[in-house]
A protein has these predicted regions:
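Conserved beta-strand -> loop -> alpha-helix junction used to position metal-binding or nucleic-acid-contacting
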Residues: 1, 90-97, 102-138
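Amphipathic alpha-helical transducer elements in NTP-driven molecular machines
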Residues: 23, 42, 70-74, 93-100, ...
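Residue-level signal for pocket-adjacent positions within structured domains
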Residues: 58, 102, 118, 122, ...
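Acidic/histidine-rich catalytic cores and adjacent linkers
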Residues: 141-268
């Protein structure tokens, strides 16, 4: 049975993909797995989730412990292109080293966005728990602002209010201000998809349920369990449902100069 499943897994990991993905999310989940010396340690599994031109979600690929470099990510996205993908409009990621350059070497027009949830996590490491709620509300005033001007003002407020006591937290946002500013090049509904990671978080929380206990013998055992989870529970949960608020997002993608022609080609 296992061998049959592994054949299915291999086929699934190399299956043809859609020609366009409006949004792609890259995130990672850690699993305990034996290394080449038989020692159990942590390995990163990168999960790539796509939302197609019609708002449907699918996991495009799983990649175990890739070296975080431009050439590795270039190979990964080259293999995604070889499976039929012609264009990716937006890609959201945690600041994975080399990913942005790797994507752009294959899909030069893709807009790469730092995931806001990860920026919040990285900045709140510096904030004591009693202030978390207030700090997060001030962060939301920035990335959830109605326009760039309000976002810039909210950042100044954040800096004035928290900068003296918690400079580490402010530094995280300061270093990524270009990603906050970039959000405001797009209408509100597209912005929301770009900065929220609900889609990939739900995939990862489902996968975490099967990685909690024990460890994996090898990469194949990881792929097998993840494949069964993705094509079983997650496929049932998604049940061909479109991404929330998709009609509005599609309208905005169809009106934007930089995406209208690119998406029109692929809508039935």
């Amino acid at each position: 049975i296992t061998d049959t499943i592994l054949e299915d897994v291999k086929e699934w990991l190399n299956r043809p993909l859609k020609p366009l993905y409006s949004f792609v999310f890259v995130d990672c989940i850690y699993v305990k797995m034996k290394n080449d010396h038989g020692v159990v340690d942590n390995h990163a599994v990168y999960v790539i989730l796509g939302v197609d031109a019609e708002g449907f979600k699918e996991v495009l690929g799983l990649y175990i412990s890739p070296t975080e470099s431009k050439s590795t990510w270039m190979k990964i996205f080259d293999s995604i292109k070889a499976r039929g993908v012609e264009d990716i409009l937006f890609l959201s990621m945690d600041g994975v080293s080399g990913l942005e350059e790797g994507v752009h070497s294959i899909f030069p027009q893709t807009v790469v966005q730092r995931c806001i949830v990860h920026l919040i996590r990285n900045s709140t490491k510096y904030i004591p728990s009693k202030h978390l709620k207030a700090f997060c509300a001030d962060c939301k005033a920035m990335y959830g602002a109605i326009n760039l001007e309000s976002a810039e003002a909210a950042f100044e407020t954040l800096k004035e209010k928290w900068g003296a006591d918690y400079p580490g937290a402010i530094k995280v946002w300061e270093n990524n201000l270009n990603h906050i500013r970039q959000l405001f090049n797009y209408p509100a509904d597209i912005r929301k998809v770009m900065y929220t990671t609900n889609a990939i978080e739900s995939v990862n929380s489902s996968l975490r349920k099967v990685t909690k206990k024990g460890f994996f013998e090898n990469e194949n055992s990881v792929f097998k369990i993840f494949y069964l989870r993705i094509t079983g529970e997650l496929a049932k949960k998604w049940n061909n449902a479109k991404m929330q608020n998709w009609a509005k997002v599609l309208n905005q993608l169809s009106c934007l100069d930089e995406t209208s022609d690119r998406i029109a080609r692929y809508i039935r």
